[in-house]
């Protein structure tokens, strides 16, 4: 049996899934995006009238994702230092990865190779 974990401190999941699920002493976070919990906006994202991306700010989005992950971890009684695996999907590896990786390295200082 699993325990469902949701929090108002992170944006509401878009689908029929919780923010996280605890099974025994393991915690599994669902896909956590960059939407702001307060107003459901995506920081740094500009769309045209048809909803197509005009521009985005990978730094602002990454910082918001990390804030959302932290909120879910804290709501579950866990913390950032207990993360053991991260899966990330970037829109443009060549452009986005250097910025993302810089922020990742600042947040995950204890797991540097």
Give names to the regions the model predicted:
Residues 2-113:
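Short, polar/acidic, helix-capping and beta-turn segments at strand->helix junctions
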């Amino acid at each position: 049996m699993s325990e469902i974990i949701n929090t108002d401190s992170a944006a509401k999941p878009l689908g029929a899934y919780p923010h996280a699920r605890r099974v025994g002493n393991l915690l599994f976070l669902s896909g956590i995006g960059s939407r702001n919990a307060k107003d459901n906006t995506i920081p740094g994202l500009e769309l045209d009238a048809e909803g197509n991306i005009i521009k985005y700010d990978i730094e602002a989005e990454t910082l918001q994702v990390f804030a959302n992950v932290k909120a879910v971890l804290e709501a579950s009684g866990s913390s950032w230092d207990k993360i053991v695996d991260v899966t990330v999907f970037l829109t443009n590896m060549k452009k986005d990865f250097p910025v993302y990786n810089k922020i990742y390295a600042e947040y995950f200082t204890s797991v540097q190779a």
